[in-house]
Amino acid sequence: EFEIEFDEPVCVCREAFSTEPKRIAACAESSGEKVSITLLPQPVPGEKVILVGTVEDVYGNSTHVQVQFKGYNDRPARIILTEVQAAKNTSKKSPHRDYIEFTVQKGGNLGGMFVQWASSTKIMKYDFIPCEVKAEEIIVLHLAPEGILEEKDETGEDTALSGGIDATAKGRDFWSEAGGLPDSSGAISVYEREGSLPIDGFFYGEGSKSGSLESSKLISIVQELSD
């Protein structure tokens, strides 16, 4: 159930709200300043939903409402960082692209979980799509795809479905176009859901550099990791 609270009494009819994706039906009812909306079927974990509707006050004045949220994941998987590959190369004999590898410590669903990584100038983000994973599975998030058809997200039983550079037949491959890892100094953090503190993370820098961080992008992630 989704609840919206206003600063004065409002009225709605049951069909006052609709959703995208349209497969989810929204039934609304009001009680004083609150509007309760039931969604059927429930959004899958991490599914992006846009809720749109209209409410009226006792004088007939209407207000348009639009809310975007993700389906709640009550069984987030527990994943930890196990390998980071930066400094992609285009070698014909041994090419490599940027990726982050995770190991699943506790099975669950990846939907709604996300990864952030930062350079000195930019913060990038990948939202995992709904996918059931088991303990000890390997997940590889590729951050510099070539954009070829063989690069496929592996959400089903076939973990050898995807091709592409650095794809693995033994783990689940996911592909992000948000941007690659910085070669020298960067930070990575992993989250169960929006608004939560990171459950794991990693900071790296050039051995020749020392002193305090000067990038606000890197500092924001490193501070969360230290909390």
How would you label these PLM feature ranges?
Residues E1, T63-S120, E177-S184, P198-S208:
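A structural motif detector for short, solvent-exposed N-terminal "entry" segments of globular domains
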Residues F2-C27, M113-V115:
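Short, surface-exposed alpha-helix to beta-strand junction/turn motifs within ectodomains of secreted
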Residues S30-G32, S36-G46, P130, A135-D227:
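Solvent-exposed beta-edge/loop recognition patches
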Residues G46-T54:
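Contiguous beta-strand segments of beta-sheet-rich domains
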Residues V55-S62:
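Short, solvent-exposed loop/turn segments at the edges of extracellular beta-sandwich modules
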Residues K122-I129:
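Short alpha-helix capping/helix-loop boundary micro-motifs
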